[in-house]
Regions:
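Conserved acidic donor-binding segment of nucleotide-sugar-dependent glycosyltransferases
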Residues: 265-266, 270-277, 286-291
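Nucleotide-activated donor-binding/catalytic signature segment of Leloir-type glycosyltransferases, i.e.
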Residues: 193-214
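Conserved donor-binding/catalytic core segment of Leloir-type glycosyltransferases
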Residues: 140-159, 164-168, 180-181
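Short hydrophobic beta-strand element within catalytic cores of glycosyltransferases
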Residues: 250-253, 263
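Donor nucleotide-sugar binding/catalytic pocket of nucleotide-sugar-dependent glycosyltransferases
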Residues: 6-7, 87-138, 148
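A short, well-ordered alpha-helix in the C-terminal region of glycosyltransferases
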Residues: 279, 286, 293-308, 314-320
């Protein structure tokens, strides 16, 4: 594709300022050597590094937020300090007259605009990273003797698997059963990680069907009847829900992050109040008992992806931002 890659060592969960400053210096050296027409920075640390570099040289820069991340989720003293410092740096970056801030949904746009004081005309929403509906083809869900619900994510508590298991326990007491397929990436060094021992315990108890890391989530979605992501993590637009909607599966999610920018309640899925396993169980029961409703929601989800979330739309909007930013 013609990409030339330059390696800069960054540790995702590290708060070591020495390591971060070293990465900043290395990245700035590379940026100076390349002298790019435009910088496009994605996720927190690259945005801070690239944004500061661009501000210092008054260069065109695009800052992309793919959700706000845990720094805007937790209220521990260290996180509040980091959040305050991050906001200060973003205020500095926002002083670049040739900078644009992209968000995946309007909640993040409004929050960062308020905290940082960004001019509204310098912000834009592009709905997610986009998905190709021709690759994630629509299919009618298969009938199973016991319905299949899919959860696929990093194995973090904040992604909602714990609440989903509580909902399953509630429904099991009412003699309502489903297979909970769980696929995901272990995050062993993360403080929010679900221990592998507990995952195996849930599997052995029949609460989940642990599939481990999957290289073909598309196939898992096709085999499922419902896709669930009760996440409280400050998401962008979750890839899992995009893929599930494109394939035509009814989705159930919490009212956080970008989940409810894709899922419209009672149209292409169900939105549940965050941190409510009881309500999650009620809404999940509704989907399990109403296959025709699921089919209608699946068709609506496919339509919504094609109209607003397709990769070609995202690409065209992004390229236009490049042209406008370089030309300003």
């Amino acid at each position: 594709l013609g990409f030339i890659c330059h390696n800069v060592s960054l540790v995702a969960q590290s708060f070591n300022m020495f390591v971060f400053f070293r990465a900043f210096l290395n990245a700035r050296k590379i940026i100076k050597e390349i002298n790019p027409d435009l910088l496009h920075c994605i996720t927190l640390k690259p945005c801070l590094i690239g944004g500061v570099s661009a501000r210092r040289s008054n260069s065109p820069v695009v800052i992309s937020f793919v959700g706000l991340g845990r720094i805007f989720l937790y209220n521990t003293v260290p996180m509040r300090i980091l959040r305050a410092l991050t906001v200060l740096v973003y205020k500095y970056i926002a002083g670049n007259k040739r900078g644009v801030f992209i968000f995946e949904h309007d909640k993040d746009r409004r929050k960062i605009s308020r905290l940082v004081g960004i001019d509204y005309h310098k912000t834009i929403v592009i709905e997610g990273a986009g998905i190709n509906p021709d690759i994630y083809k629509f299919s009618i869900e298969k009938k199973h003797e016991i319905p299949i619900v899919l959860f696929a994510s990093r194995m973090l508590w904040s992604k909602g698997l714990g609440d989903l298991i509580e909902a399953k326990k509630i429904l099991r007491q009412k003699n309502i059963h489903f297979v909970l397929n769980v696929a995901g990436i272990l995050a062993e060094d993360d403080k929010d990680a679900i221990p592998l021992e507990l995952i195996h315990h849930w599997h052995n108890e029949g609460l989940i069907n642990w599939l481990g890391r999957s290289s073909n989530v598309y196939e898992l979605i096709q085999k499922s009847n419902i896709v669930a992501l009760p996440s409280v993590y400050p998401e962008g637009v979750p890839r899992l829900l995009l893929e599930a909607s494109s394939v035509g599966r009814a989705c159930i999610a919490y009212d956080t992050g970008g989940c409810d920018s894709l899922i419209i309640h009672n149209y292409n899925g169900l939105i549940v109040k965050s941190n409510s396993a009881q309500e999650l169980a009620v809404e999940l029961e509704y989907l399990l008992k109403n296959p025709q409703i699921r089919l209608e929601m699946g068709a609506n989800g496919r339509k919504r992806v094609k109209e607003l979330f397709s990769s070609i739309l995202v690409i065209n909007k992004t390229l236009q931002i490049y042209k406008d930013t370089i030309g300003c």
